Amino acid sequence: MSATRSQRSSTISPARPRRSPATIPMKRPETPSSSHFSASPVTSSSPLLRSSPSPSTSSAAASSTAVASTKLKENITVTIRFRPLSPREVNNGDEIAWYADGDYTIRNEYNPSLCYGFDRVFGPPTTTRRVYDIAAQQVVSGAMSGINGTVFAYGVTSSGKTHTMHGEQRSPGIIPLAVKDVFSIIQETPEREFLLRVSYLEIYNEVINDLLDPTGQNLRIREDSQGTYVEGIKDEVVLSPAHALSLIASGEEHRHVGSNNVNLFSSRSHTMFTLTIESSPHGKGDDGEDVSLSQLHLIDLAGSESSKTEITGQRRKEGSSINKSLLTLGTVISKLTDTKAAHIPYRDSKLTRLLQSTLSGHGRVSLICTITPASSTSEETHNTLKFAQRCKHVEIKASRNKIMDEKSLIKKYQKEISCLQEELTQLRHGNQDDLADRKLQVKLQSRLEDDEEAKAALMGRIQRLTKLILVSTKSSLQAASVKPDHIWRQAFGEDELAYLPDRRRENMADDGAVSTVSEHLKEPRDGNSSLDEMTKDRRKNKTRGMLGWLKLKKSDGVAGTLPTDGNQSQASGSPSSSSKYTQTKTTRRENAAAIKSIPEKTVAGDLFSATVGPEDSSPTGTTIADQMDLLHEQTKILVGEVALRTSSLNRLSEQAARNPEDFHIRDQIQKLEDEISEKKDQIRVLEQQIIEIFGMTPYASDSLGMPQVLSKLTMQLNEKIFEHEIKSADNRILQEQLQMTKSENAEMQETIILLRQQLDSLAERQSTQQIAGDESSGKNIHNRNGEESEIYSGAGTPTSVMSLNRVFAQEETKEIYNETALNSQALEIENLKKEKMRLIEEKDELGKLNKKLTEEASYAKELASAAAVELQNLAEEVTRLCNENAKLSR
């Protein structure tokens, strides 16, 4: 008696006094529900109410869980969870009306004979993890093996249903623990592969809403061979626990909640979180391999409400809908326990319609009833216990679900993966034909890039030399300065014609003379003296041309006998300009030594030496502009030569790296380096001359003349840039044609070499066979005593054994050649197959690496999204706690 007393007091708050109970017999009393079904005393063999096992038998019952799960029939697992008295109930003076008598019995404080027995009773100190291990873990394990499972919480409002199912950050509820347990089971089952989908809905005022898709409102319930389902519900495939929990958190944001006088945050709707589990053997199985399909329903029911909640308006309508659905649920449970019931009203509410497959026995069911021990809600608690007692008598038959049709999503994905793999294989076979062409293109592209710089420099040099030979504006500018109405054509001299063929040189000289005379005749007759003088000068300098004129100016400049010096100095009228010009002439004479060092063999050297020019000539704007143009062209030519020699130097350096003992290559490298340094010195001298010529212009101090010179130079620069762009485009086209021609020539050379080798080998074989045939024919003739040695002369046809042997040898040679060609082709095909297999393996490895990186990236994104959701939940929880603290402090 004392032992029983101490056990009861351990589950009751010590701060609450209670009356001493009446004398209680040692055996287990009958419950009100059991007396309704049977008048005999309750025993352990009663089919309607299982008695509470003794401590000695509890361990045996726990150890035989696996055996019990294999039975054909079993009952709904019913557990009860007490919550402690709330501060509001304590302040109102409520006392404890119901308490847990051990782990399997609940008794009434005021009527100890009123007691109920269940599969497990949890007191207030019990954690949610302990509740999950006993009440829900077996259901979750069965769902992973293909057996449907349902876990739902039932109780009055503010009894702790949502706390039990969802929990909080420090104490997760049944739903988070089940999700984590599912992924743990997947990790520990490597022989099977799984596909998980989740859906989340609510039943609000008898209307089904999709919490994962806010646009899914007022959904309809349908039925097929697998059972009932919601049409149009969103199924989201999940890959990790964080992903699933983030979906739950997003769905909770759309759930309907409200407040009443007993609960600040009261659920105003039933919610059902469904986890659809598909599994099949890992790897590629047979086509007839079955797929397990099961659903795990985790349901948080809204609490039944009485008139004590004092709700009005919309809250009253919500409470009415909640009570109606819960009443229908109770009616369905009662009909299921009545063997004589002909009709079960599943369709009277949306909740029972969704639970039709579950309650009709297709799967395991665990009911967690949450109750409060407060005396103010004693009647509601009693009704909850009676509902739980009725549920305990519902029989179910759990069986593994298998689907053989095409409704399995995992089968659909597997077939799609197989189709994609076949397409990938076909693409690999198709791409093998293009690999050789692509490799050849890569090689040609690399060779083109190597030679591009040298070719560009060479083409640029050709263009600049062409411009220097064919274009001259010097004489026309001088003629325009003397008489603007007269325009003279510049004739080519012997120096320019030396670069042309003999026939073209004669034609050009004759054309120049004729054109000069014709232009004289076309001009008006005024200014005869000036024209005569200009004609004499032109005939005198006719054979010199531009280069000869420059050389003549050079000799005149050295003598210093030009009469225009004094005029120019007097015309300037400025001592500063005169002294500046004198200083410039002195500087240019000092650079004469450096100028003479430039070789005269090249065109650049001739033009460079010609620019020593008229040291004492008048520095007019046109003269200086022409000299600067000429110096710029010479600089470009030298730069092109430097680029060409640099490219040659790079190639020789590569050859020297391959053949370090070749002294001839080293000598060539040293020679090229000396030439490059010499060209660079010449470029520096030309740049210095350009600067000096620009400084000696008479417009340096005249602000009116300088813009004209600059505008002229700008126009010339634009014209040359345009010409350069056009010729660059032509150059690119020519380079492409040249490259194509080179590749064709290389292929033809390779073919010719191969044919020559084959011809040589055939000739050797033919000669060998001919010698062997001669020897054999000689032996045959000797054995036949000369009878066969006669030669019958005919009309050019072979009449001896030797001739016949030659014919046979030719036929054998053809056969050998054909056999050799076939062998070479077979060997080439074998090499191509090996190369193909190697490329396929490399592509597979790259595909695996890409897939791995993609999975890691998706997993990182999921973790980031889950972390963001957790942070948001924490922020909301902090806000809620702050609000509660503020209200409590008031």
Curated annotation (Swiss-Prot):
Residues 1-73 form a transit peptide. Residues 75-394 form the Kinesin motor domain. ATP binds at G155, V156, T157, S158, S159, G160, K161, T162. Residues 40-66, 569-579 have a biased composition (Low complexity). Belongs to the TRAFAC class myosin-kinesin ATPase superfamily. Kinesin family. KIN-7 subfamily. CDD domains: KISc_CENP_E (cd01374). This is Kinesin-like protein KIN-7C, mitochondrial. Residues 395-468, 664-693, 729-765, 818-884 form a coiled coil. GO terms for biological process: microtubule-based movement. Keywords: ATP-binding, Coiled coil, Microtubule, Mitochondrion, Motor protein, Nucleotide-binding, Transit peptide. InterPro entries: Kinesin-like_fam, Kinesin_motor_CS, Kinesin_motor_dom, Kinesin_motor_dom_sf, P-loop_NTPase. Residues 1-13 have a biased composition (Polar residues). GO terms for cellular component: microtubule; mitochondrion. One of its GO terms (molecular function) is microtubule binding. Residues 1-66, 511-595, 768-797 are annotated as: Disordered. Pfam families: Kinesin (PF00225). It is found in: Mitochondrion. Transmembrane segments: none annotated.
